[in-house]
């Protein structure tokens, strides 16, 4: 008798959070200098003259995938520099392990050295570098491996073009992708398994859309 093969249905991925940007109630802004973070018609616009980090309030836990669309605006405005499409994920603060938002951070980049987090700075240094770092909670050291210090023009920013960002923290697998291209694929033997997501930029003008957090399938 021939044996029957029964296909197992693959469960859909779970959307843990979704923000359609009708308000800023899910976000905490840290700005080095006065700037603008505003929402309108499903778009979150950040227009700032200096450093700015916008933290998503809920704590996330691994496995997790974070997706959003970002457009670096170049339309002649004072901050339209096209630089620093940056982000933290799985971030905790060594100064306040029990309450992430109890630590004082001004938006100045140096204030984030004591995070434990994954970080990508795409198009940093006036759109000349794209870097991945694993922050270790040290006030001085921010380790940077040579293979995570990229300067190829194909991994830099293009003005006024939507960039679909995908971040993954799934066990020891840490990844960063842009428009379907895997840019960083990092194996972490001691992975960060919980923490916050933060969008980071400095002296730039950016529009964010379609922010979603997924619980990826596990095999």
What residues fall within each predicted segment?
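Sec-dependent N-terminal signal peptides
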Residues: 1-3
């Amino acid at each position: 008798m021939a044996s029957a093969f029964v296909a197992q249905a693959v469960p859909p991925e779970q959307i843990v959070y979704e923000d359609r940007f009708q308000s800023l109630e899910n976000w905490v802004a840290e700005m080095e200098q006065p700037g603008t973070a505003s929402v309108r018609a499903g778009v979150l616009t950040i227009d700032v003259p200096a450093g700015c980090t916008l933290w998503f309030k809920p704590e996330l836990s691994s496995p997790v995938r974070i997706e959003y669309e970002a457009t670096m605006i170049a339309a002649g405005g004072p901050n339209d520099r096209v630089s620093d499409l940056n982000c933290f994920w799985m971030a905790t603060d060594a100064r306040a392990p029990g309450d992430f938002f109890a630590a004082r951070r001004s938006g100045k980049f140096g204030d984030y050295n004591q995070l434990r987090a994954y970080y990508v700075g795409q198009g940093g240094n006036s759109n000349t570098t794209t870097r991945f770092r694993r922050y270790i909670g040290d006030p001085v050291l921010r380790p940077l491996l040579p293979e995570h210090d990229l300067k190829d023009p194909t991994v830099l920013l293009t003005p006024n073009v939507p960039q679909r960002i995908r971040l993954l923290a799934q066990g020891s697998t840490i990844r960063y992708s842009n428009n379907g291209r895997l840019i960083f694929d990092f194996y972490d033997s001691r992975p960060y398994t919980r923490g916050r997501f933060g969008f980071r930029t400095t002296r730039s003008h950016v529009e964010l859309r379609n922010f979603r957090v997924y619980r990826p399938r596990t095999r």
